[in-house]
Amino acid sequence: MPRVLLHCCCAPCASSVLEYLTQYFQVTVLWYNPNLYPQAEFDRRFRALVELIEKMGLADKVDILAEPWKNQDYLRRIKGLEDEPEHGLRCTECFRVRLLETARLCKHYGYDYFCSTLTLSRHKNAELINDIGEELARASGTSWLPSDFKKRDGENRSIELCEEHNIYRQLYCGCEYSMRRRIEVGESMGQTPGESTGGAV
């Protein structure tokens, strides 16, 4: 089987993607998400990813390459973009910093492809993510595996898998700015931030 280095942003997005890709690839999951804030949330999401892989019976099929919390990597890249709206230039740089590291490690370890679970969410622009992946692949001499994992009912399947295995599903995308936005929205609706039963925003 060809080998793919799969950047995983969270357990929910990884669920149906792993179910699909492990049929055709030898998958190594890369946990590199310096955008996540605070560190306790970073740690919680990583534990959820490991738990998911175990509960799906993929522990013998999927390797995990995990990097520690490096929030400064993210903050350096988005300097000057702090006030950008959600889905704006700050988010584009967030995609780029994670895929840049994925491309680097793909080259270093000799994987056949690199890819990301980011395209599963309906809140993410798959065309933009694929464009960044292709650009970084050309620059690094690697191969990007294009995807739009939300197709073929991928996002709904991820919800089913998380409910089946009782996997933590976060309420905000991940960075400090999206967390603040979620709190503001929740307060305006009289809600208290907590775990999601309906998927990440």
Task: Give the label of every model feature segment.
Residues 1-19, 24-201:
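Nucleotide-activated chemistry modules centered on ATP-dependent adenylation/adenylyltransferase
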